Swiss-Prot record:
<comment type="similarity">
    <text>Belongs to the SIS family. GutQ/KpsF subfamily.</text>
</comment>
<dbReference type="InterPro" id="IPR035474">
    <property type="entry name" value="SIS_Kpsf"/>
</dbReference>
<comment type="function">
    <text>Involved in the biosynthesis of K-antigen capsules. Catalyzes the reversible aldol-ketol isomerization between D-ribulose 5-phosphate (Ru5P) and D-arabinose 5-phosphate (A5P).</text>
</comment>
<dbReference type="InterPro" id="IPR004800">
    <property type="entry name" value="KdsD/KpsF-type"/>
</dbReference>
<feature type="domain" description="CBS 2">
    <location>
        <begin position="282"/>
        <end position="317"/>
    </location>
</feature>
<dbReference type="Pfam" id="PF00571">
    <property type="entry name" value="CBS"/>
</dbReference>
<feature type="site" description="Catalytically relevant">
    <location>
        <position position="66"/>
    </location>
</feature>
<feature type="site" description="Catalytically relevant">
    <location>
        <position position="118"/>
    </location>
</feature>
<dbReference type="GO" id="GO:0046872">
    <property type="term" value="F:metal ion binding"/>
</dbReference>
<dbReference type="InterPro" id="IPR046342">
    <property type="entry name" value="CBS_dom_sf"/>
</dbReference>
<dbReference type="InterPro" id="IPR001347">
    <property type="entry name" value="SIS_dom"/>
</dbReference>
<keyword id="KW-0448">Lipopolysaccharide biosynthesis</keyword>
<comment type="subunit">
    <text>Homotetramer.</text>
</comment>
<dbReference type="InterPro" id="IPR000644">
    <property type="entry name" value="CBS_dom"/>
</dbReference>
<feature type="binding site">
    <location>
        <begin position="63"/>
        <end position="68"/>
    </location>
    <ligand>
        <name>ATP</name>
    </ligand>
</feature>
<dbReference type="GO" id="GO:0019146">
    <property type="term" value="F:arabinose-5-phosphate isomerase activity"/>
</dbReference>
<feature type="domain" description="CBS 1">
    <location>
        <begin position="217"/>
        <end position="273"/>
    </location>
</feature>
Length: 317
């Protein structure tokens, strides 16, 4: 196997114009998005949102090439925010995947030209099944648009690509339309963070929204009595490996906590440590939350109170 040589970043220089080109492209696509928001047909969007909201089956996306990639993302966003959805490849549809479609499903077909052959071939079958069709296209007079129940136009003069060939602006606009529809449905369905977490249990957000204090709290936290000496406190914090120790009163209730930070602050202001007791060093009334408190609520409370430790209380006190 021949050795591969990685390119040297210093072996060639980039024409400064290319950085200008990057800025120009971002500005142009941003301007096209602004233009779309101004020219959108509110009647068509109202019809589309009603179709999605009243769909009894799945919202199915389909598109070829780059439009297909965008369709997959749109479908994933809808599905993860409360609108059942999946993507079907138009070419695969003619080799058995049409069986995935039921009369209760709503189809969103994506084609910038509105004349993509593989997409148009789907239309007769979909009409025969009785499915409603939404077209996302840049050509309101196209064959696809004429056969759709609702049409969302891109209102795009040309692609940002200097050759007006590579799908660039069209995919950006289509992606934005997908996001806009999904967000409208989130608001219509009153889709809340807890609902979002049900579909994202493996992500960090899902963990924060589904996990309770009891699920992550440390048990067997070291404890000392109110009259414990400075040396005893140090020993218990060190052996506990949790950076803190709880201080218990005579009845075994929580009187306070002592953290590494509490020790440092106490040592800075006290000259004599040999006679110091836990009662003098501890933080009284530490942040205490019921064990069934959601982690996201606990984190917000800890940030607000500027503390690194929270005590989980079975009694909810």
């Amino acid at each position: 196997m021949s050795e591969r040589h990685l390119p040297d970043d210093q072996s060639s220089t980039i024409d400064p114009y290319l950085i200008t080109s990057v800025r120009q492209t971002l500005a142009e696509e941003g301007a096209r998005l602004q233009n779309l928001s101004k020219q959108l047909d509110s009647g068509q969007y109202q019809r589309v949102l009603n179709l999605i909201m009243n769909c009894k089956g799945h919202v199915i996306l389909s598109g070829m090439g780059k439009s297909g990639h965008v369709g997959r993302k749109m479908s994933a966003t809808l599905a993860s925010t409360g609108t059942p959805s999946f993507f079907i490849h138009p070419a695969e549809a003619f080799h058995g995947d049409l069986g995935m479609i039921t009369p209760y499903d709503l189809l969103i077909l994506i084609s910038a030209s509105g004349e993509t052959d593989e997409i148009l071939k789907l239309v007769p079958s979909l009409k025969n099944f009785g499915n409603r069709i939404i077209a996302i296209t840049n050509n309101g007079n196209s064959t696809l648009a004429k056969n759709a129940d609702a049409v969302l136009e891109l209102h795009m003069a040309n692609e940002t690509c200097p050759n007006n060939l590579a799908p660039t602006t069209s995919t950006t606009l289509t992606m934005a339309i997908g996001d806009a529809l999904a967000i409208a449905m989130i608001r219509q369905r009153k889709f809340m963070p807890n609902d979002f977490a049900r579909y994202h249990p493996g992500g960090s957000l899902g963990r924060r929204l589904l996990t309770r204090v009891a699920d992550v709290m440390q048990h067997d936290v070291p404890a000392v009595q109110l009259d414990a000496s400075f040396k005893t406190v140090i020993q218990r914090i060190t052996s506990g490996c949790q950076g803190m120790v709880m201080v218990e009163d005579a009845e075994g209730g929580l009187a306070g906590i002592i953290t590494d930070g509490d020790l440092r602050r106490f040592m800075e202001k006290e000259d004599s440590l040999t006679s110091a007791t836990a009662a003098q060093m501890m933080t009284r009334e530490p942040l205490t939350l019921p064990e069934d408190t959601m982690i996201i609520e606990a984190e917000e409370k800890m940030q607000k109170d500027k503390c690194l430790n929270v005590i989980g209380d079975q009694q909810g006190k």
